[in-house]
């Protein structure tokens, strides 16, 4: 198979949603259809003893939420699919954001009872900004929820994107009968999936069935006719630019409508795209020369070995285990002899991978998030990955001073994952951690105890706003202000931490010569 042929069968996407919309459950069912797993363990496994394949970290298993981004690959219908299950909790938006930089499309899961929720909106905006195709799966149709037209209107108005329903539900909740596939004019019954029913062009049922006298069926047919009369067509160009989302109805937990979605997804989702360098050059996925970038670092995927894995998205060319690659940031060459693919915590050695694939590289501390890796004598850097400005800051120290070595190793590794940000006060070298949300600190505390055997003390510093210094101004007078704390980030950039917006404005008025900026 040529490189082009290998690349063209790849599909790489992330699943995004608000917590509890059914994102991880949908991931499990997709893996089932891909033959990657034999039995789905749902995230509700904290009661049943089963755990979701994509939820591998101890804290995830206990809480039933996804707080890391899991990467899984499976084969389906002659395609190789790379699926990234992103953190659902809003506190982990920074990790999710970076993950969305490594995919070519996204699947948005919506709870039919709740519609568009805050986290869904936030993540959608990131996808929209990237201009990647977005597929929508409206979940939990076997429960009572909003009407289909209401949901479509909410998506269009709130997200400012056109919708095109690929199928249509018959009833919902207790009266949920199934879905009508608009393309094939078939009905897939919820309770009897094998017994597919057929409609003619006028939506008349070809088989004799009691459903024809059901009011939910009559309503669904009337609604579908209204949709058809509106005359909207499925515009693939609009899908590719992120201006139209195909909508699917189903129930991930009941494994219903999932294969209908998956079949359409592999038909319409894009193959791997290229990526721009800092100089604006577009690197094509079909370029023979290898290139890739690190978008995530995860420590302790195997706590027995205290290992670190750097997740790399391949942008161009082919990766071969044992090949020499160069890290652009350091201009150093390295031989990659340990490379892996994932099924959550189950890993397999990767000998060969191409554009669109995501592989793990064992990391002894060489890699940073955003690193560009290239083959041969290439010299370019991909566009930088964005970083979020933290909104909560905590002083942190070990309860047991004899555990300093473990404490600092834990801090170093967890900070390098990018889930939490590190700062140090200028004169006392006090460690301060910054996060987007409170849950990140809870997970940090749990992992320090569980993975590094260190109990930590965390104290709020009373600061909520971080601003980086943009110019080389004299900051000696500003350092003595009681309304701010001067710290350095892990790259030794100087940062002021403020109590609130008022304190920030006061500082800017008092010291106009100091120019400040914030991250995203």
From Swiss-Prot:
Major localisation: cytoplasm
Localisation per UniProt entry: Cytoplasm
Chain ranges of the tr-type G domain: 8-273
Keyword terms, alphabetized: Cytoplasm, GTP-binding, Nucleotide-binding, Protein biosynthesis
SUPFAM superfamilies: EF-G C-terminal domain-like, P-loop containing nucleoside triphosphate hydrolases, Translation proteins
PROSITE patterns in alphabetical order: G_TR_1 (PS00301), G_TR_2 (PS51722)
Residues binding GTP: 17-24, 85-89, 139-142
InterPro entries hit by this protein: EF-G-like_DII, EFG_III/V, G_TR_CS, P-loop_NTPase, PrfC, RF3_C, RF3_dom_3_sf, RF3_GTP-bd
Highest taxon above the source species: Bacteria
One biological process term in Gene Ontology: regulation of translational termination
Molecular function terms from GO: GTP binding; GTPase activity; translation release factor activity, codon nonspecific; translation release factor activity, codon specific
Pfam family, one: RF3_C
GO CC term (a single one): cytosol
Disulphide bonds in the chain: none
Stored Gene3D superfamilies: P-loop containing nucleotide triphosphate hydrolases, Peptide chain release factor 3, domain III, Translation factors
Positions in coiled-coil regions: none
PANTHER family per record: PEPTIDE CHAIN RELEASE FACTOR RF3
HAMAP family with a match to the protein in the record: Rel_fac_3
Known role: Increases the formation of ribosomal termination complexes and stimulates activities of RF-1 and RF-2. It binds guanine nucleotides and has strong preference for UGA stop codons. It may interact directly with the ribosome. The stimulation of RF-1 and RF-2 is significantly reduced by GTP and GDP, but not by GMP.
UniProt similarity note: Belongs to the TRAFAC class translation factor GTPase superfamily. Classic translation factor GTPase family. PrfC subfamily.
Protein name as catalogued: Peptide chain release factor 3
Protein source organism: Macrococcus caseolyticus (strain JCSC5402)
């Amino acid at each position: 198979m040529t490189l082009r042929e290998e690349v063209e069968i790849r599909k790489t996407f992330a699943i995004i949603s608000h917590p509890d919309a059914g994102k991880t459950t949908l991931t499990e069912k997709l893996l089932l259809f891909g033959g990657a797993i034999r039995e789905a363990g749902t995230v509700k496994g904290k009661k049943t003893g089963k755990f979701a394949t994509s939820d591998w970290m101890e804290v995830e298993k206990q809480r039933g939420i996804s707080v890391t981004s899991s990467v899984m690959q499976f084969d389906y219908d002659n395609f190789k699919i790379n699926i990234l299950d992103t953190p659902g909790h809003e506190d982990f938006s920074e990790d999710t954001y970076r993950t969305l930089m490594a995919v070519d499309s996204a699947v948005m899961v919506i709870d039919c009872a709740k519609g568009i929720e805050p986290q869904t909106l936030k993540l959608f905006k990131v996808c929209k900004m990237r201009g990647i195709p977005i597929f929508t799966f409206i979940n939990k149709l076997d429960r009572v929820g909003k009407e289909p037209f209401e949901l479509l209107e909410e998506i269009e108005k709130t997200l400012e994107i056109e919708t095109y329903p690929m199928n249509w539900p018959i009833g919902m909740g207790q009266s949920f009968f199934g879905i009508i596939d608009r393309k094939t004019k078939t009905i897939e019954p919820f309770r009897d999936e094998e017994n597919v029913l057929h409609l003619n062009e006028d939506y008349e049922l070809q088989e004799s069935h009691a459903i024809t006298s059901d009011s939910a069926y009559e309503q669904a047919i009337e609604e579908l006719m209204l949709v058809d009369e509106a005359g909207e067509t499925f515009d693939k160009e609009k899908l590719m630019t992120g201006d139209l989302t195909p909508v699917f109805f189903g129930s991930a937990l009941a494994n219903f409508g999932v294969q209908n979605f998956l079949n359409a997804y592999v038909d319409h989702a894009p193959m791997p795209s290229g990526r721009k360098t800092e100089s604006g050059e577009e690197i094509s996925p079909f370029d023979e020369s290898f290139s890739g970038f690190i978008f995530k670092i995860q420590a302790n995927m195997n706590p027995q070995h205290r290992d670190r894995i750097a997740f790399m998205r391949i942008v161009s060319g082919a990766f071969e285990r044992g090949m020499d690659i160069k890290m652009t940031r350091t201009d150093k060459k390295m031989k990659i002899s340990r490379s892996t693919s994932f099924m959550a915590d189950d890993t397999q050695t990767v000998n060969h991978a191409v554009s669109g694939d995501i592989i793990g590289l064992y990391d002894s501390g060489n890699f940073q998030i955003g690193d560009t890796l290239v083959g041969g004598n290439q010299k370019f850097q991909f566009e930088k990955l964005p970083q979020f400005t933290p909104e909560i800051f905590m002083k942190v120290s070990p309860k047991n001073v004899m555990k300093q070595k473990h404490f600092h190793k834990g801090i170093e590794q967890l900070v390098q994952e990018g889930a939490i940000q590190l700062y140090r006060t200028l004169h006392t070298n006090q460690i301060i951690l910054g996060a987007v949300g409170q849950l990140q600190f809870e997970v940090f505390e749990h992992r320090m105890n569980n993975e590094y055997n260190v109990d930590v003390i965390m104290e709020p510093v009373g600061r909520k706003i971080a601003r980086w210094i943009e110019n080389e101004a004299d900051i000696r007078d500003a350092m003595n202000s009681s309304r701010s704390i001067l710290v350095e980030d892990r790259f030794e950039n100087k940062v002021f931490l403020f109590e609130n917006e008022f304190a920030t404005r006061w500082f800017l008025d008092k010291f106009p010569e100091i120019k400040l900026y914030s991250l995203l």
